[in-house]
């Protein structure tokens, strides 16, 4: 019988029940029954993560529901309690005198992850973790509360997208002004929220013995194979190789359109003819995706059919729904769920194929032996998502209007390249923020403008007050909710673009290599997974150089010096 999302029901954990179950793990360890203890430990974590994922998903589906908010707050309060038990058991196993027996039961990578995990928690920061989760939830709810008037309708921030991509320049400018009016109105509250988050995180780092939050954040992200200096070198690679190409792309657009100046509201209009739209509404797109994945072969089609028929998709934008898109999973049943906000633009296709990449990877690696291995660290996970965006290119005729597939492909490539400077801008901003946690809100806004001048030198807000004064970063939820995550998109995109290059030479080989990468799940750290896939590490000097050259040729743009 096919699994249906509507029938999923994960027991609500209590502190008492959790203490009992984790206590059973300790008892088994006391009896030297390591294999049984590890099996129970894994089961408990799968049960808890499934319930927690469902709780977060339901809140995202309706942020206005008091019941959903209450349950999410309850989950946030449980997280430090559960983490304390998990860390204690991990520490006990890592300190076990019979490391040969432990090593026989757990992979070296799992043990390395656990060594990292035990340095990120202590009962002294339990209250701070709960406060961090609460403040992050406040940001989500505030952004979801936006009610914006434009074009005779009331929309949320996601609903602005069709206006922001209009071929009418005045409409795009209006959308930009409406967007930033919301952030200007809520700017002081957003500044206060962020200030509290920065100090909560800085205090946690101090309590755990770190010099600054950055080092703790890297460990929380389970980055066991690279550090801030490696990331700084990658940022310079982007600045050296990608920023000049994006500048030329934007200058060609300005000249083509005959504009005296290119403003921020002109950047979303990637194609002067108007950004290609997908072939129809939500229902049509979902149906056409089935044809596309069936055509790609292998088990992509059958997997997507399971998701579609089982109700594991929530793609339509609606009032009260949290913004953005994500993929979550329920490890007790081995089935992922895709959440998105379709808004009628080409972005719907990008978000959908991106989250489908996450979902497919999680499904392919569902049989790996430990819950720690079901997902890669997020840097590697984003390769799976972004690579699928490019691997679906040959089938875009199914997803966009007739004759617009090639325009879509060019637009997707330009959008991907343009993202890289913004991605490293966000990352550099965060490194500076947490190096100086006592900055005032005004200093943080000045810092953002400094970062924009460094990585986005073309950016001109046309005098719109809030972003011109350095407030653009407040719209980037990752900065509030997931510090230091954003660079993962840029690192992964460097790798995904190599899949694009490979697919242009041999689509079948690229797809085989992609499936193999998905099957590995989180069985190795980022740089090892990259190497196993035959990709060049983003941290290697010149990693982006050849990709940028091929992209420039594809787009018929001469690079500086050519």
For each predicted feature, which ranges?
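Post-HEXXH active-site segment of zinc metalloproteases
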Residues: 350-351, 362-387
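Active-site-adjacent "gating/activation" loops or surface patches in catalytic cores
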Residues: 158-170, 278-353, 358-362, 465
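Active-site-adjacent bridging/hinge elements
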Residues: 110-112, 214-220, 260-265, 324-335, ...
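Conserved active-site neighborhood of enzyme catalytic/cofactor-binding cores
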Residues: 315, 379, 383-398, 405-412
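Glycine- and acidic
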Residues: 120-121, 178-186, 226-232, 267-278, ...
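C-terminal, non-catalytic "cap/extension" segments appended to globular domains
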Residues: 108, 113-115, 352, 360, ...
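A well-structured
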Residues: 1-276
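Long, well-ordered alpha-helical segments
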Residues: 194-200, 204-205, 210-211, 249-253, ...
């Amino acid at each position: 019988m096919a699994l249906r999302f509507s029938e999923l029901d994960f027991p609500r954990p209590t502190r008492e029940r959790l203490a009992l179950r984790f206590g059973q793990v300790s008892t088994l360890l006391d009896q030297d029954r390591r294999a049984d203890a590890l099996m129970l430990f894994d089961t408990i974590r799968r049960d808890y993560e499934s319930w927690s994922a469902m709780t977060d998903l339901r809140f995202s589906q309706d942020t206005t529901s008091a019941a959903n908010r209450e349950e999410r707050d309850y989950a946030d309060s449980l997280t430090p309690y559960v983490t304390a038990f998990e860390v204690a058991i991990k520490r006990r196993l890592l300190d076990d005198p019979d490391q040969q027996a432990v090593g026989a039961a757990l992979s070296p990578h799992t043990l390395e992850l656990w060594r990292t995990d035990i340095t990120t928690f202590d009962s002294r920061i339990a209250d701070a973790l709960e406060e961090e989760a609460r403040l992050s939830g406040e940001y989500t709810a505030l952004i979801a509360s936006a009610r914006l008037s434009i074009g005779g309708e009331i929309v949320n921030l996601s609903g602005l997208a069709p206006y922001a991509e209009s071929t009418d320049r005045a409409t795009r400018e209006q959308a930009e002004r409406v967007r930033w009016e919301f952030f200007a109105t809520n700017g002081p509250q957003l500044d206060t929220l962020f200030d509290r988050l920065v100090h909560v995180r800085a205090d946690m780092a101090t309590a755990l013995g770190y010099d600054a939050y950055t080092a703790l954040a890297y460990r929380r992200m389970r980055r066991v194979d690279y550090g801030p200096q490696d990331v700084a070198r990658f940022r310079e690679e982007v600045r050296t190789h990608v920023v000049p190409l994006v500048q030329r792309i934007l200058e060609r657009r300005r000249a083509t359109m005959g504009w005296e100046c290119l403003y921020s509201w002109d950047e979303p209009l990637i194609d002067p003819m108007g950004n290609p739209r997908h072939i129809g509404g939500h229902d049509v797109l979902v149906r056409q995706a089935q044809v596309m994945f069936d055509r790609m072969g292998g088990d992509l089609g059958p997997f997507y059919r399971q998701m579609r028929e089982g109700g594991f998709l929530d793609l339509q934008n609606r009032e009260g729904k949290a913004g953005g898109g994500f993929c979550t999973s329920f490890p007790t049943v081995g089935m992922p769920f895709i959440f998105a906000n379709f808004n009628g633009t080409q972005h719907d296709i990008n978000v959908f194929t991106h989250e489908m990449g996450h979902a497919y990877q999680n499904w392919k690696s569902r049989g790996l032996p430990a819950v720690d291995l079901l997902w890669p660290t997020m840097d590697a996970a984003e390769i799976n998502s972004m690579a699928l965006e490019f691997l679906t290119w040959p089938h875009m005729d199914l997803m966009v209007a007739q004759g617009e597939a090639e325009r879509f492909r060019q637009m997707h490539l330009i959008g991907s390249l343009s993202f890289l400077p913004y991605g490293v801008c966000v990352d550099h901003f965060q490194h500076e923020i947490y190096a100086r946690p006592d900055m005032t809100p005004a200093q943080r806004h000045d810092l953002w403008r400094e970062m924009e001048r460094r990585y986005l030198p073309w950016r001109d807000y046309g005098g719109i007050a809030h972003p011109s004064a350095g407030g653009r970063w407040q719209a980037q939820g990752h900065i509030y909710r997931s510090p230091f995550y954003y660079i993962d998109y840029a690192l992964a995109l460097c790798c995904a673009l190599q899949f694009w290059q490979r697919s242009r030479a041999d689509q079948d080989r690229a797809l085989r290599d992609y499936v193999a990468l998905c099957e590995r799940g989180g069985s190795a750290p980022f740089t090892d997974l990259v190497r196993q896939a035959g990709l060049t590490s983003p941290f290697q000097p010149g990693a982006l150089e050849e990709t940028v050259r091929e992209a420039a040729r594809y787009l018929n743009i001469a690079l500086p010096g050519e």
